[in-house]
A protein has these predicted regions:
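Short, surface-exposed, charged amphipathic helix/loop patches that serve as local interaction elements
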Residues: 2-6, 15, 20-96
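Carbohydrate-active enzymes and regulators
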Residues: 9
C-alpha cells in the first residue's frame, strides 16, 4: 500500500480486524458527519473498509454506538499522518 492507502489492524478483545483505508474512504466519512449524524458514518466507515471475511464478526460489535465511535476514532487516529504542526504567535504590535 502507498502512503495514502493504509492497511490497519485493530485488536478488539481476542479478535483482530484488518481495515483497508483510502483517502476516498476517509473523505466520505468526514463529508457524512453532521451535527446530528455521527454514529452512522462511523459504522459505514468500519463496515466498508474491514476485510470481507471479518464483516460478519464485526457487525454485532457495532450495535453499541460508543464502540462504533471508539473503533472509528482509533482507526482514523492511526491513519492520520505523523506531522508536527506549530502555530506561530501573532505579533502584539499592529502594523499599518
Amino acid at each position: 500500500m502507498n502512503e495514502q492507502n493504509a492497511e490497519i489492524t485493530l485488536e478488539v478483545g481476542e479478535q483482530e480486524f484488518t481495515f483497508n483505508l483510502t483517502p476516498a474512504d476517509v473523505t466520505k466519512y468526514f463529508n457524512a458527519l453532521t451535527q446530528t449524524n455521527k454514529v452512522a458514518p462511523g459504522n459505514n466507515l468500519l463496515m466498508t473498509t474491514v476485510k470481507q471475511d471479518k464483516r460478519a464478526t464485526l457487525k454485532p460489535l457495532l450495535g453499541n454506538p460508543v464502540m462504533v465511535m471508539q473503533l472509528a476514532g482509533t482507526l482514523l487516529e492511526e491513519y492520520a499522518p505523523d506531522v508536527e504542526v506549530i502555530v506561530k504567535k501573532r505579533s502584539a504590535t499592529l502594523s499599518a
